Each structure stands twice: as C-alpha cells, then as structure tokens.
C-alpha cells in the first residue's frame, strides 16, 4: 500500500505538488493520470525517496522509502528506462542490481524470461531499442519480487503486442495482491488496464476513485437516434424537455435513456433506424475533469 498525506513539493516559487492525499490500495491496478506538468513524475520520485517533500509524507506499507531495510524487495519501479550503464550487458545490469540487494543470481534469468528478453541477455544495454529498454526496466522493477510496484509510462516505445503484454502483466501482478501504480498518457489503454484512478492537475488531487465512478461523475451517457422523420422526432424530444444536438443524419439526446427516447417515438408513430446509447469514454471524462488544470496547451491553428 502507498499512502500520500498532504504531500507537497516546491521548486523555488513553483508548487509542483500541492497537499496531495490519497491511498493506492493493493490488489488492483491504479492508474495515475494528469496533464503534462501536473506533478505525476515528481510524486513518484518522492514516493521512491529521489526527491524530498517540502512537507507531508509518502509511505510504502507505513514507512518512507529511506526507512526500508531492503528497498528492492519492498518496492520496484520503472521511471526512466534509459537509466542504465550503456556498456553493461542486459544480464550483467540485472546481476549488478541483484548483487547489491542480496538477491539470488537465479532471479535474473527468471525476470529475463518473464519479460521476454532472454534472447538479448548478452547485448549491451545501451544498444537496445526503446521498447526493449522498457522491458529491461520492467525486469529490474520485478527483480526483488516486491509487493509494491510503480511504473511511469511503461508502454512507451512498445508495439501493440508489447502493450498487450504490459496490460496482462499489470493485471496479473495486481491479481497476486500487489500494489500496482502506473502512469500513462494512453487513455484508451488505461481504460483497459486500470481498476482505480488517481487524477491530478497542477499538483492537486482531482479524483481518487474507480474508473467507472470517474467516468460516470464526469459525463453522462447520450443517446444517438436516426429516423426518416428526424425533424418531427426532434420537435417531440424538445417538447419533452430534452436537450438535443442535431447532425445531418442523426440526433444526440442528452441526459436520458434509449427506453425513454424509444417510447416517445412510438407514442408519435415515428419509425427509428437507430437507437443506441453512447457511453462517455475515459478520454472524454478525463479531458472534461482536467480542462482547467492543463498547464501546457497547444494552439489548434
């Protein structure tokens, strides 16, 4: 379990993380979302003792990282896959980590097999592609078989098969009762992987909840309907007090259900060619909830 209590980090006059409090529970995959500059990496660095909080605390099973007697056996992390000695082989990089943390050498070959890079074990780490470097970083995180795992953008550089593999791995690790805390900018992938979300903006907590609750809270489903009598149907729906958006071939009806729209159409003998519920996606909910917290915004034109 990871607990953040009023976690705050200032860099000069800039507040990167602002009184952040939440709990990352074991047994589920918790996604960590926020716009660029929101404070995600800084938060992870404070959890791992790489940055000191200005105030507040970040603890792993009740202890700060610096209080852990066997850190690699307590928490594993992937923050930057390129942080390796470029001239060491893949296997020797992991053997060095194992030796300095009193981890049996046999564990090195186990994690190499687990992440699918046994075939490049003798290759210099500095020559690996980004995708292979990510796999090596994940292997390093798993080396101590820790109960708590943090991954910062673990699917960067991975092909579709690799992304699917990471998704399966995260869910397997959580299913074993571990705490899995993972950040990603690929929201479609996060919606397939995460059980819970921690969402921040400008260093402040926006939400700490399940994926389903977050999506439901940040946007209601709409109903899409097509009919050969579109104008008449629109008038019926508006007269019923519903909010309706019109496109050339369909209507989008807000804050209602397919049952309600279907009953109104039937009552007025209006044929329907399509009647479907359009669920809010995680991406739509995320953009809605973080719109005011975006630090870096590009121009559309």
Predicted regions and their residues:
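ABC transporter nucleotide-binding domains
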Residues: 2-4, 9-182, 187-201
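Short, flexible turn/loop "capping" segments at secondary-structure junctions
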Residues: 49, 72, 214-217, 245-246, ...
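Conserved NTP-handling cores and scaffolds of large molecular machines
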Residues: 101, 218, 241, 279, ...
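Short linear loop/turn motifs
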Residues: 126, 249-253, 279
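ABC transporter nucleotide-binding domain
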Residues: 166-252
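C-terminal coupling/interaction segments
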Residues: 256-301
